[in-house]
Curated annotation (Swiss-Prot):
It comes from Mycobacterium tuberculosis (strain ATCC 25618 / H37Rv). The gene is lysX. The chain crosses the membrane at residues 80-100, 122-142, 146-166, 177-197, 214-234, 272-292, 497-517, 612-632. One of its GO terms (cellular component) is plasma membrane. Pfam families: LPG_synthase_C, tRNA-synt_2, tRNA-synt_2_TM, tRNA_anti-codon. Mg(2+) 2 binds at E1091. It is a multi-pass membrane protein. Disulfide bonds: none annotated. Its cofactor is Mg(2+). Catalyzes the production of L-lysyl-tRNA(Lys)transfer and the transfer of a lysyl group from L-lysyl-tRNA(Lys) to membrane-bound phosphatidylglycerol (PG), which produces lysylphosphatidylglycerol (LPG), one of the components of the bacterial membrane with a positive net charge. LPG synthesis contributes to the resistance to cationic antimicrobial peptides (CAMPs) and likely protects M.tuberculosis against the CAMPs produced by competiting microorganisms (bacteriocins). This is Lysylphosphatidylglycerol biosynthesis bifunctional protein LysX. GO terms for biological process: lysyl-tRNA aminoacylation; phosphatidylglycerol metabolic process; phospholipid biosynthetic process; response to antibiotic. Residues 726-804 bind DNA.
């Protein structure tokens, strides 16, 4: 599996930490055995990318500035650990150099002797002391408290020695100076260390001091014995009785005893060996002493159960989330229990595995807890495999994000083997199928135990490494009963022998993520491609919508370096990666994923200081199994003993000891999905209503009961006889409470009435109960009899009532309603609830639609429905909406007009046909345009466009009669008076015959100069320039005439007017005029600047129709998005002969606008609105 490294920084804010620890073993990874005779690279989810992280940084990296501090906070002594570490580190370095170089030893002889005598132990040649000082320096820098104690003890002891020497006296002036200076330095160092005590917070293991002493003693004894033996073999000039003491002095005495005490010397090379023996003993002891808290256990059953619960609740977007259940990881939870981070500690680096698991809103809490844990034990934090969202969370915690590669994601809905880009995969699949291979796909739960055992045996035997690899993208187990939802894909030969397998873990409920891949050495080339392809092609039957394949490290470098025109740096970087791919298969892994044309999703590393990247790289290599340390417990079974789940979550009793997932509904009930600082924030009025709802439920009242029909509407109740028994239902719009008597305004669709609740007339309860239980906007059912209030207002005298719908949000202003037009569009339901005008518009629109249908039905028209999804866009010149059908892997268009299908029906003999439905055009949005709209298209055989002049007028006048009660249109009017400006609507009579004018006559009148169909293009352009009408140079004369018409005629028209005889070139589906050259039999109906409809004498000549559509298709091929495409099926239908036909197209939305005097956004129930 690929590796993802990060080295985050540290944060502490005083909160508690829940964690458990683990040992360093792991079990399995996803890789594939490769044979020399096969070139099928397959998809290896091996740790090759992990090795590559040692090479450097990705060519596509993003470095982000830390937005906030990631440390405990800066005290005045925060510099003490670093200063102490650097000081000891310098001495360690010089000591090591002096031990191996006589020249260095001679150069530093004088200062070394002074430091050694008065300040700090600094022998001339002692590897042991050099390594011990180096470890001490590292521990001090890491803020280890035990290192602070060791250094402080050394300083105190040295100060005591110097004080004793000063008190004894008898020293030379130089010696007195050195002792006084040393004593002063020690006192200052002790004071500084004591003051900086709180800066050394990192803990070590319990009993570390005793373990370190035991390790050192054992190592020293072995070293002394070995050294004594060497001295006996090579004594040099040492006397026999001095050999044991000399060896002991060199091994464990740090050469502190004066060499002059010994009369002889052994061979020179032995001193270095003796120092190494001592170094080994001291290094072992120091490692044990300074080692941070280590993990002796891993996930417990409760931990794994909690993680699975979080995955069920929140894991649908994390392709690597299931790998958090790998059992050689430890886990730390957010205090809320709603998120956690799994990690593992290697060589002092705490490697977090991917994103936090759980609620995204609780991720910062989990990251804080993890960083506090790292800081507590002095670990260097690192993250492997963070997604973009996860990397952003780590960045907000003070880290830096670096993009290292990309994860390959297959979308089965888009996957296909056809096309030139899939040629390689297609050929590989063909070879595998020719070899007789078939693919079997099953869930692990459907596999028998004995068969699963065989599967595990095959996976082990086909592994090309001695141990399993993987950490961040490998589960580490196969066939575990807890992983019953995992998917097994097997390639089977004609003899029913399994030759290869894929195991994939769940990714939410609709995805799978590759865990393990194996293949037999006898498997034919193309086996892996066959399994992946079959999985993708049959994913729908398995309920799978996404497949995570692999991680390709440095993908961008390979891709960009191979591009034409790539720069020298990009080419050089790619060349280096190709070179290293000879060993680590970096390019092979990239290409084996790329051939499936996946979606590449970036994965990130995070770190605080670039200096620790090599250390984190080593830790990741160890975690992924590429570097196996001595005494490694990687292959051991891991079962934790100390749960890390927060007490709040453990106390629920929902977690299972066997690690199985808890009851998700139970987790929701205990508030795991809505707790600790990220609860739903609600306005105060809404919270009050929610509280009231809870009180009603606790009292046994169902605020949302099953409905029952009322006996009357409000309007019917108001018209009922006095004392008539009625029941009505509606929304409470107003409440007036007078103690024992309460008045409320009740509104339903038919109207509004007053209801009266009098304590003396209620069958149960009192008016106060109603007032306490209800709010404005609630839906109630009232039962009683009709009567009147004391003022004579008709009222329903209530005897009983029932709450049938609790309104949890307050209604808008009860007097003004919704005033903001945008708010009225976005919340049309509220607009209808409080505004009578909006309800009237809905009713008027319904009346218009009904009147149009009834008028056409009365004339013998048949209503039909034609496809909305069409393979070609035609029937009008407009920009279409494009969508995609996965089944056939092809683009489709939302229809811009139903014309071409309705004409097919005309060819089939349907003589009078219409469709009233939705059309879609990807054009502008304004007061008269909406991307989706209601369109009427009607076709009448043996008629022409003049026939439809009377037909269209009749349709609109009948619609106006149905909506307004008379053939009138409502027009906006503004009156200015002494009391200000007043806007209102006034009726305009639209009965009678409407004017009919030719297009060219209307333009001529507007220009004051005569034009006709024969007017040349040059003349028309000059007229445009004079009138200020824009045009394009590629337009012909017909298009220029149409532009003049739109600017000078259409927008200035008020009373409904028919403009007839448009230029032929702008009417591709219209019959040429029967007597006038250059124009077509077409009219447009315009009223108050808006086009309401158009009608044609339809073009029925298939030869001419083909010629015109071919011209349109050339325009489309030239880049015109509105030009129609060539519909060969339609043209073939026309060749069977269509009768002479008149066709009408009318925009119903605009007719409603005309009749109601409102904009299109007001007349549509739900017009398209931009998102918030």
């Amino acid at each position: 599996m690929g590796l993802h490294l990060t080295v985050p920084g540290l944060r502490r804010d005083g909160r508690g930490v829940q964690s458990n620890s683990h040992d360093t073993s792991s079990k399995t990874t996803a890789d594939i055995s490769r044979c020399p005779q096969h070139t099928d690279a397959g998809l290896q989810r091996a740790a090759t990318p992990g090795i590559s992280r040692l090479l450097g940084i990705s060519s596509r990296s993003v470095t982000l500035t830390k937005p906030r501090s990631a440390t405990r906070g800066n005290s005045r002594y925060h510099w003490v650990p670093a200063a102490a570490g650097w000081t000891v580190g310098v001495i360690a370095t010089l000591s090591l150099l002096a031990s191996v170089s006589p020249l260095i030893r001679w150069i530093i002889k004088v200062p070394r002797e002074f430091i050694n005598d008065y300040l700090f132990n600094f022998p001339d040649t002692n590897f042991a002391w050099s390594f011990v000082l180096a470890l001490l320096a590292a521990a001090l820098t890491a803020r280890k408290r035990i290192a602070w104690l060791v250094l402080l003890a050394n300083m105190v002891l040295a100060a005591v020695v110097n004080a004793a020497e000063i008190a004894a006296g008898g020293n030379t002036a130089a010696e007195s100076f050195g002792e006084n200076l040393g004593f002063a330095v020690h006192v200052v160092a002790i004071v500084v260390l004591v003051l900086g005590y709180r800066e050394f917070w990192a803990k070590v293991r319990r009993g570390a001091l005793f373990r370190a002493a035991a390790v050192w003693l054992a190592g020293a004894v072995v070293g002394i014995v070995a050294s004594w033996g060497l001295v006996e073999l090579f004594p040099g000039s040492l006397a026999p009785d001095e050999r044991l003491g000399y060896a002991a002095n060199r091994v464990v005495g740090f050469a502190l005893a004066d060499p002059d005490l010994f009369t002889g010397r052994p061979h020179v090379f032995l001193n270095a060996i003796f120092g190494l023996f001592g170094a080994f003993a001291l290094i072992g002891a120091a490692i044990v002493l300074f080692l941070s808290q280590r993990a002796d256990n891993a996930l417990t059953g409760e931990d794994e159960s909690a993680i699975r619960g979080l995955l069920d609740l929140y894991g649908k977007d994390d392709s690597l989330g299931y790998f958090a259940t790998r059992r050689d990881k430890s886990v730390v939870f957010a205090s809320s229990g709603r998120a956690c981070i799994t990690y593992r500690v290697e060589v002092g680096v705490c490697l977090a595995s991917g994103d936090p698991v759980g609620d995204h809103r609780a991720w910062p809490q989990a990251v804080d807890a993890w960083l506090r844990l790292c800081q507590t034990y002095g670990w260097a934090p690192g993250v492997m495999g963070a997604s973009s969202q996860g990397a952003q969370t780590y960045r907000e915690a003070g880290l830096t994000a670096l993009e290292l590669g990309d994860e390959a994601i297959l979308r089965p809905a888009d996957f296909k083997l056809s096309g030139p880009e899939m040629r390689g995969v297609r050929q590989a699949v063909t070879r595998a199928r020719r070899a007789g291979l078939t693919v079997r796909i099953r869930r692990h739960r459907d596999i028998a135990e004995d068969e699963m055992a065989q599967t595990i045996t095959r996976a082990d035997s086909w592994r090309d490494t001695e141990t399993e690899r993987g950490f961040s993208m490998a589960l580490g187990r196969l066939g575990d009963p807890a992983d019953s939802d995992c998917l097994l894909v097997e390639a089977i030969d004609p003899h029913n022998q399994v030759l290869a397998m894929l195991s994939l873990v769940p990714w939410g409920t609709t995805g799978v993520s590759l865990d393990l891949m194996r293949r037999s050495p006898q498997s034919p080339n193309g086996t892996i491609e066959l399994m992946v392809s079959e999985l993708a092609l049959h994913a729908e039957s398995l309920g799978i919508t996404r497949i995570s394949l692999n991680f390709a490290v440095f993908r961008a470098a390979f891709e960009q370096g191979a591009q034409l025109g790539a720069g020298p740096v990009a080419r050089l970087w790619r060349g280096l990666l190709v070179f290293f791919s000879r060993w680590w298969q970096l390019e092979t892994l990239y290409r084996s994923n790329m051939k499936y044309q996946p979606e590449w999703v970036p994965r990130y590393a995070c770190y605080e200081d670039a200096r620790v990247i090599p250390r984190v790289g080593v830790a990741s290599v160890i975690a992924e199994g590429f570097l196996v340390l001595p005494f490694s417990r990687r292959n051991r079974v891991h079962t934790g003993h100390h749960p890390a789940v927060p007490e709040r979550l453990a106390a629920t009793g929902l977690l299972h000891h066997d690690g199985s997932a808890p009851d998700v509904s139970g987790l929701r009930q205990v508030g795991l999905t809505n707790g600790d600082g990220v609860e739903r924030r609600l306005p105060e009025q809404v919270r009050v209503r929610f509280d009231k709802l809870e009180k009603l439920r606790s009292s046994g009242i169902d605020a949302f009961p099953v409905g029952r029909p009322p006996s009357h509407t409000v309007a019917q109740a108001l018209a009922a006889d006095h004392q008539a028994s009625v029941s009505v239902s509606g929304r409470i719009m107003r409440i007036r409470n007078y103690g024992g008597v309460l008045f409320a305004q009740l509104r339903d669709w038919s109207g509004e009435m007053q209801v009266l609740l009098d304590n003396s007339r209620l069958d149960q309860g009192c008016a106060a109960d109603f007032n306490a239980a209800t709010d404005l906007g609630d839906l109630v059912e009232m039962t009683g009899h009709m009567g009147a209030s004391k003022t004579g207002t008709p009222s329903l005298i209530v005897s009983g009532w029932r709450l049938i719908g609790k309104c949890l949000r307050p209604l808008p202003n009860k007097w003004k309603g919704l005033l903001d037009p945008e708010a009225r569009v976005r919340t049309r339901y509220l607009d209808l609830a409080v505004n009578a005008e909006s309800r009237a518009l809905i009713t008027a629109r319904s009346s218009v639609l009904r009147a149009v249908r009834e008028t056409l039905f009365a004339k013998g028209f048949v209503e039909v429905e034609t496809p909305i999804l069409q393979q070609l866009h035609g029937g009008a010149t407009a920009r279409p909406f494009v969508t995609h059908i996965n089944t056939y892997s092809m683009d489709l268009f939302l229809r811009i007009a139903p014309e071409l299908y309705l004409k097919r029906l005309c060819v089939g003999g349907v003589e009078r046909v219409f469709e009233l439905g939705r059309a879609f055009r990807n054009e502008g949005v304004d007061f008269s345009h909406n991307p989706e709209f209601t369109l009427l298209e009607a076709y009448q055989a043996h008629a022409d466009y003049l026939e439809w002049i009377d037909g269209c007028r009749e349709l609109i006048q009948n619609a106006a009669q149905a909506a307004n009660g008379a053939p009138i249109a409502m027009r906006p009017r503004t009156d200015k008076g002494s009391d200000g400006t007043r806007h209102h609507l006034e009726p305009v009579d639209i009965s009678g015959i409407w004017p009919v004018r030719t297009v060219h006559d209307a333009i001529s009148e507007a220009l004051g100069e005569r034009i006709d169909a024969d007017t040349g293009l040059t003349t028309l352009r000059k007229l445009c320039d004079a009138a200020g009408v824009p045009y394009r140079t590629q337009w012909d004369a017909g298009a220029v005439v149409l532009e003049l018409y739109e600017h000078l005629v259409e927008c200035r028209t008020e009373q409904p007017t028919f403009y007839i005889d448009f230029p032929t070139s702008v009417s591709p589906l219209t019959r040429p005029h029967r007597s006038k050259r250059g124009v077509a039999e077409r009219w447009d109906l315009v009223a108050w600047g808006i086009e309401l409809g158009t009608a044609y004498s339809e073009l029925t000549d298939p030869v001419e129709q083909r010629r015109r559509l071919q011209e349109q298709s050339l325009l489309a091929a030239g880049g015109d998005p509105e030009a129609m495409e060539l519909d060969e099926d339609f043209l073939q239908a026309m060749e069977y002969a269509m009768p002479p036909t008149g066709g009408l197209g009318m925009g119903i939305d605009r007719v409603v606008m005309l009749i109601t005097g409102r904009s299109i956004r007001e007349t549509l129930p739900f017009p398209l609105a931009k998102p918030h």
